[in-house]
A protein has these predicted regions:
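Prokaryote-biased recognition of long, low-complexity C-terminal linker/tail segments
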Residues: 153-184
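Intrinsically disordered, low-complexity regulatory segments
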Residues: 1-150, 154, 180-183
Length: 184
């Protein structure tokens, strides 16, 4: 991991590296995801046109079953007493912003966050990036754009899949990206 090398965090632990006063860890894709419909209301276990559309009033999130271990490691690291602040070094883009912020929120962390924004993983670029960290708030619009995309995809996927599955009588997966790609 290039960040760890540049920072001198070379002592490998379970799910992170530590050294030189730094902890370096990672996300494995989307560790935190939107809850399925049945979390909002048990009636959604059964698919019925009468229950559509499903439009959550307050969005709920769950830690992905496949990433619970790494989420637990991140949560524990965020709450360590010797950790004063956190650097979001997830991918530079809206999905990286979303991935980090959902983990941070789900972990219940309140520590200050800075953003590392890189277009290169070369050592010099990493050093320069760490020397020029930005306040996380400068990326709020990017995070909000990612939230909108995620929630729109969820609503289209859940509602359209259930509608067409009920009409067709067999399970069908419908989604914003899937449908145009299949139509090509």
């Amino acid at each position: 991991m290039s960040y760890a090398k540049v920072l001198g965090a070379t002592n490998r632990q379970d799910g992170y590296l530590e050294g030189n006063g730094y902890l370096v860890s990672w996300c494995i894709g989307h560790l935190v995801e939107l809850a399925p419909p049945n979390v909002y209301d048990a009636k959604y276990v059964k698919w019925s046109i009468a229950d559509l559309p499903i439009l959550p009033e307050k969005w709920q999130y769950l830690v992905s079953a496949s990433t619970q271990k790494q989420f637990g490691i991140l949560q524990k690291l965020m709450h360590r007493p010797d950790v004063e602040s956190i650097v979001n070094s997830c991918d530079s883009g809206r999905e990286g912003e979303l991935i980090f912020r959902l983990v941070y929120q789900q972990a219940g962390c309140k520590k200050p966050v800075s953003r590392l924004w890189l277009s290169s993983m070369e050592e010099n670029a990493i050093r320069e990036g760490f020397a020029n960290l930005k306040p996380s708030t400068e990326y709020d619009a990017l995070y909000n754009a990612a939230l909108c995309r995620e929630r729109a995809d969820w609503m289209v996927g859940i509602n359209a899949s259930r509608l067409f599955s009920c009409l067709y009588g067999q399970p069908l997966a419908v989604g914003r990206v899937m449908t145009p790609v299949l139509a090509m």
